[in-house]
Amino acid sequence: MSLRNTQERWGSLAMAFHWAIVILILTQFVLANMAESLPLGMAKLATLARHKSVGITILGLAALRLGWRISNRGHNPPLPADLKGYERFLAHLTHEGLYLLLFAMPLTGWMMSSAANYPVTFFGWFRFPALVGANKELHEVYEEVHEFLFSALLVITVVHVLAALYHHFIQKDDTLRRMLPFGRRRAA
C-alpha cells in the first residue's frame, strides 16, 4: 500500500490519520461521559485532564491530516462519477463540516478551560498557554458552544457513516473500501 493517495484509494498515511482520529473521538466520548458522572474531585479532574490531552492530540492530527490532504491535491480519490449533484454537495458539506469540527471542538474546549482558569496540558508533560483570560461568563458560553459542536459532530458523523455504508452495501462501489487498510477493490 502506498504512503501517498492515489486516484483509486487513500494512502496509508491518510488512512492512519482517519482511523486514529476516529479512535480518539470515541475515546473523547467515553472520557466526557466518565467525567460527567463523577463528583467534583481528583478523579473527575484527572479524567478531564485526559480529555483535554486527547482533544489537543485530535487538534494536532487534524492539522497534519489537512496538510497531508492539501499536499496530495490532485491525487485524492475522486467521488464516484455517478453521484447526483445534491449527493456531491452533501459529500463535500459533510467532509468540510467534519474538518471544521475537528478544529472547533478542541479549540472551544481549550477556550472553555482557559476561561475557567484551568490549565490545558499534554498528558502532564507540558502546559499550553491560555487562549482567553479567566472569565466565568465566557466559560459558560464556550461550554455551551462546545456541547453544541459535539451534537453537530454526532449528527455529521452518523451521516458520514451511513453514507459510507450506503455506498458499500447499496451502491456496491469502492467508496468505503478505499479508506479501509485491508480493503480490496471489487471485481468489475
Question: Model-found features: residue ranges?
Answer:
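Membrane-embedded alpha-helical bundles that constitute the cytochrome b-like, heme-associated redox core
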Residues: M1-A188
